[in-house]
Curated annotation (Swiss-Prot):
Top-level lineage group: Eukaryota
Name under which the protein is recorded: Jasmonate-induced protein homolog
Family: Belongs to the jasmonate-induced protein family.
Species assigned in the record: Atriplex canescens
Listed InterPro entries: Jasmonate-induced_protein, Nakanori
Pfam families recorded: Nakanori
């Protein structure tokens, strides 16, 4: 199975991620989020995506929980409240399908430490591809990749022609995470 970690985001991916980070920032300010990651995701595929699973290394979702679905061409948000020691560290997986109707999955993981430092920065990790790839997830492997991840990244699975891009930034007392789930065609 071929896949590629892209060298850089396309202009469209960067624009989408920036818009989602801004949406997360506005939501965080409005609800006065503290020690949290405010996550905003947009579905740029041609079908609705459904929530499959989540994993929490530190913290938990608050409020209405994870969005059960993300309709096509729309965005959804949630707040992941961090704990005082390690901040907000979690992941979500959404299922949908690619342009050929094949079942696919998109994974977004984030790390928003309580006290961001040069040695403990905000990080994101993303993955996508055939749905079967996400049937059994090694969360230890995802965490190891997240622990060395950058603040912005993107990934394309060439077999399924799916793509995902994400970014995280500190916004005072919380982190804003933006992600775009899409197709590479």
């Amino acid at each position: 199975m071929a896949s590629t970690q892209a060298m850089g985001m396309t202009e469209q991916q960067k624009k989408s991620v920036d818009e989602m980070v801004e949406k997360a920032t506005n939501m965080g300010v409005n609800v006065q989020a503290q020690n949290s990651a405010v996550v905003s995701m947009i579905n740029q595929t041609n079908v609705s995506m459904t929530f499959n699973e989540n994993h929490n290394w530190s913290g938990s979702v608050v409020g209405t929980g994870y969005p059960k679905s993300i309709p096509t061409k729309q965005s959804r948000q949630f707040i992941h409240q961090g704990d005082a020691k390690d901040g907000s560290q979690g992941a979500v997986v959404y299922y949908g399908s690619n342009a050929n109707g094949e079942p696919c999955g998109w994974l977004l993981a984030w790390c928003a430490p309580t006290n961001v430092t040069p040695t403990k920065p905000n990080r994101v990790y993303v993955d996508c591809g055939a749905q079967s790839k996400f049937d059994t997830i090694s969360w230890d492997t995802i965490k190891a990749k997240l622990d060395v991840g950058p603040a912005t990244t993107n990934f394309t699975d060439v077999d399924t022609e799916t793509t995902i891009a994400a970014g995280v930034t500190s916004t005072g007392s919380f982190a804003s995470v933006g992600a775009a789930f899409g197709l590479s065609t």
